[in-house]
Regions:
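Gly/Ser/Thr/Ala-enriched C-terminal appendages of enzymes
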Residues: 169-174, 179, 187-377
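Short hydrophobic alpha-helical runs that function as membrane-insertion/retention elements
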Residues: 4-5, 90, 182, 203-206
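Buried, small/hydrophobic-residue-enriched core segments of structured protein domains
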Residues: 1-177, 187-193, 197-198, 211-213, ...
Length: 377
């Protein structure tokens, strides 16, 4: 979960609220959706193809960036490559094929333009009767004499599972077993999972609208809440927002977040929210408990408590060295690997717990009790 602590004069802290939520909510949402799709692909490459369906230019550019962090191997948004170094990739358009007098002529011309990166779109007219046969002819007549091999073909419509099986057989028989098949057309993690289960002969997926808009879950509900006030003497006064909905009761105080790892397998056990000055002693057993159902407890030993947050600004100056984009991608992948499969599965996943330390839980309950007392008075 994203967590940011802003400690600033009240007016300044309020001014950054909207922009922080805009950036964090949107890109966290897209990165999460991308990661689900990538995991569904089971090692097959996934490219982000969604710019045309994004909700504005910034959503396309930053959404593509987030998709890469989530695990996509490329994007059709070229400016994202220019700005962040995320690999730009893509294939031909249907309009390219339509502009020529014949599909074969369109394919042969494209092969001449991109002999080392040829991916032909074979569904403009008929995948099996013209698209794949003409692609094979173009490979034979243009690429083969040049000593080049095709990268692949793309199928963008129809029963892709069925068509990919037939296309794979045709390509193999023509001497192109290394020619990859890319599938696109309103895909998401569920469709990709089903296609693979049904035996689709697909090597790559181009995922557009359902990724760039996170169609299945289009809102990420991150919030920005006042947690404490510091007076002129430096005393911190925890603040709480109370709601009839238990889930919307905020957790007070300036906080520090630890991620607790099991040293035996380096799997994440839970996250632990603490008061900002708390230090976890790794030499002693640690009791984790559900902050709402406190009788649910777990005592762990042989663990590592890793502080998650890093300071970005201090006294108005940036003190953080921004990591290279590829390092952000690697970090995200490594953290996902620390989660149990039961947590990352699509149906009925286990809850990943964010617990409170005993000290923070006591602060929260004190403020709740104090509010009840004042209300009763």
């Amino acid at each position: 979960e994203p967590i940011i602590t802003v400690r600033a004069p009240a007016v300044q802290a309020q001014l950054v609220e909207t922009y922080l939520l805009l950036c964090i909510n949107h890109q966290t949402l897209i990165a999460t959706k991308a990661n689900r799709i990538v995991r569904a692909a089971q090692g097959r490459a996934v490219s982000e193809f969604g710019s045309r369906r994004a909700h504005g230019a910034d959503a396309a550019i930053l959404g593509a960036r987030a998709a890469g962090i989530g695990g996509c191997s490329g994007t059709a948004c070229t400016i994202t490559d220019q700005l962040f170094g995320f690999n730009a990739t893509g294939t031909m358009a249907h309009s390219w094929v339509q502009m020529f007098d014949s599909e074969l002529e369109a394919f042969k011309t494209y092969c001449k333009c991109y002999p080392n990166g040829t991916v032909l779109l074979v569904d403009t007219y008929n995948v099996l009767k013209s698209g794949v046969p003409n692609a094979i002819k173009a490979f034979d007549e243009v690429l083969k004499p040049m000593g080049c091999r095709p990268v692949g073909i793309r199928i963008d419509s129809g029963d892709i599972t069925y068509l990919s099986k037939k296309a794979r057989k045709m390509l193999d028989e023509a001497g192109y077993p290394d020619c990859k098949i890319c599938a696109s057309n309103a895909l998401d993690e569920y469709l990709i999972r089903d296609m693979i289960y049904q035996g689709a002969k697909v090597d790559m997926f181009g995922v557009g609208e359902r990724l760039i808009t996170a169609k299945s879950e289009p809102v990420f509900g991150g919030v920005y809440k006042l947690a404490a006030v510091e007076d002129d003497d430096g005393n911190i006064q925890p603040k709480i927002k109370i709601s009839e909905n238990v889930a919307k009761i905020t957790t007070p105080h300036f906080k520090k977040l630890y991620r607790i790892y099991d040293k035996d397998n380096h799997k994440a056990v839970a996250d632990l929210l603490c008061v900002h000055d708390e230090v976890i002693d790794e030499s002693r057993p640690l009791t984790l408990f559900d902050p709402q159902f406190t009788w649910k407890k777990k005592v762990i030993t042989n663990f590592e408590a890793k502080p998650i947050q890093q300071q970005i600004f201090k006294d108005g100056k940036c003190v953080y060295k921004k990591p290279a984009y590829e390092n952000i991608v690697k970090y995200a992948a490594a953290e996902i690997d620390t989660l149990w499969d039961e947590i990352t599965r699509f149906e009925n996943p286990h809850t990943y717990y964010v617990d409170l330390s005993q000290k923070l839980w006591e602060v929260k309950n004190y403020l709740l009790a104090e509010n009840n007392r004042q209300t009763a008075d």
